[in-house]
Amino acid sequence: MDMKKLIERINFLYKKSKEEGLTEEEKVEQQKLRREYIDIIKGNVKVQLEGVEKIPTANRKN
């Protein structure tokens, strides 16, 4: 599932939970989607951090 659709579905389930409640299946789906979203974000942060290169203090420009 692409990120936009994932977020849309998470938001839909959140709004539905506040307005009328969720079925047990929807609650399970909501938790699964939230976990998938968090895992994607963690992966993106990890990739970004792995690409960071430390510059020695002597080579920095102020």
From Swiss-Prot:
Superkingdom as given in the UniProt entry: Bacteria
Family: Belongs to the UPF0291 family.
Organism the protein comes from: Clostridium botulinum (strain Langeland / NCTC 10281 / Type F)
PANTHER family, per database record: UPF0291 PROTEIN CBO2609/CLC_2481 (PTHR37300), UPF0291 PROTEIN YNZC (PTHR37300:SF1)
The organism's taxonomic lineage, starting at the top: Bacteria, Bacillati, Bacillota, Clostridia, Eubacteriales
Keyword DNA-binding: no
GO CC annotations, alphabetized: cytoplasm
Pfam family, one: DUF896
Cellular location(s): Cytoplasm
Transmembrane segments: none
SUPFAM superfamilies: YnzC-like (SSF158221)
Assigned keywords, A-Z: Cytoplasm
Stated name of the protein: UPF0291 protein CLI_2672
Gene3D superfamilies with a match to the protein in the record: Helix hairpin bin
InterPro entries cross-referenced by the UniProt entry: DUF896 (IPR009242)
Keyword Transmembrane helix found: no
